[in-house]
A protein has these predicted regions:
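Acidic, metal/ion-coordinating pockets
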Residues: 19-161
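Bacterial N-terminal signal peptides that target proteins for export
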Residues: 1-8
């Protein structure tokens, strides 16, 4: 009887230890308003790489205005594409739209979204006349059982004047 009780207590203790919450650190890295500053990408890549070397759980996101504002990127065969290629290479997880993502029109924006290897979310661009695919309003990124929700929202910008 004592052996059964002891075995039962050991089993309960083992189960409790397995179910105990464990402390984990998740690092959230965010960029925004990069405005095609391609010359700064090596520093960004080094910082992200160093973070990934020391932290196991890293999520990389962007809040928009990424591909216009630099002559080299603006005049590329596909304007903006150098930034998207670098962001794909760096392994972004999620992005939303900024007002400057619309600078070249909706068809261009749709092509750029198709070129991204990461999720693009935006909750407040809803229109029957959009020429790019309807974007999901949010996404959930899972890192080792930690679930983080991201909702994309773009500023309501109608332009000057």
């Amino acid at each position: 009887m004592k052996g059964m009780l002891r075995m039962g207590l050991v089993a309960v203790a083992a189960l409790a230890a397995a179910c105990a919450p464990r402390e984990r650190t998740l690092v959230l890295l965010s960029t925004n308003d990069m405005h095609a500053k391609i010359q700064r990408f090596p520093q960004l890549a080094a910082a992200v790489g160093a973070c990934r070397d020391t932290a196991r759980l890293v999520v990389l996101v962007d809040a928009g205005d990424r591909w216009t504002g630099n002559a080299y990127v603006d005049m590329a065969p596909t304007p903006g594409m150098p930034m998207i290629a670098l962001m794909n290479e760096l392994g972004y997880d999620v992005a939303t739209l900024g007002n400057h993502e619309f600078d070249h029109g909706q068809a261009f924006l749709g092509r750029m979204i198709d070129s991204m290897d990461f999720e693009v979310v935006c909750a407040n661009v809803v229109s029957d006349t959009c020429t790019f695919p309807q974007l999901p309003p949010y996404t959930i990124v899972d890192r080792d059982g930690i679930r983080i929700g991201f909702v994309g929202v773009v500023t309501n910008y109608e332009g000057p004047g």
